[in-house]
Amino acid sequence: MGAKKNLLAELREKSSEELDEFIRDNKKALFALRAEAALQNKVVKTHQFSLYKKSIARALTIKQEKKDRVHG
């Protein structure tokens, strides 16, 4: 649970541009993992799919919170 809190704290400290970069990097990594799973017959660590998706969702949530704080 501590690792998740550290990630959230780090994400909250980032600027909007840094959050965009974090989201882009995680989406690229998720795409690469999906491509690897589809194109190769080797075992892929399937738990990484959900880890990437959750990281993306957390970053998008924090980005929306920052946007609401500025406009709301």
Curated annotation (Swiss-Prot):
Molecular functions per Gene Ontology: structural constituent of ribosome
Entries under InterPro entries matching the protein: Ribosomal_protein_uL29, Ribosomal_uL29, Ribosomal_uL29_CS, Ribosomal_uL29_sf
PROSITE patterns: RIBOSOMAL_L29
GO terms of biological process kind: translation
Alphabetically ordered keywords of this record: Ribonucleoprotein, Ribosomal protein
Signal sequence bounds: none
Family named by the database record: Belongs to the universal ribosomal protein uL29 family.
Name under which the protein is recorded: Large ribosomal subunit protein uL29
UniProt organism field: Chlamydia trachomatis serovar D (strain ATCC VR-885 / DSM 19411 / UW-3/Cx)
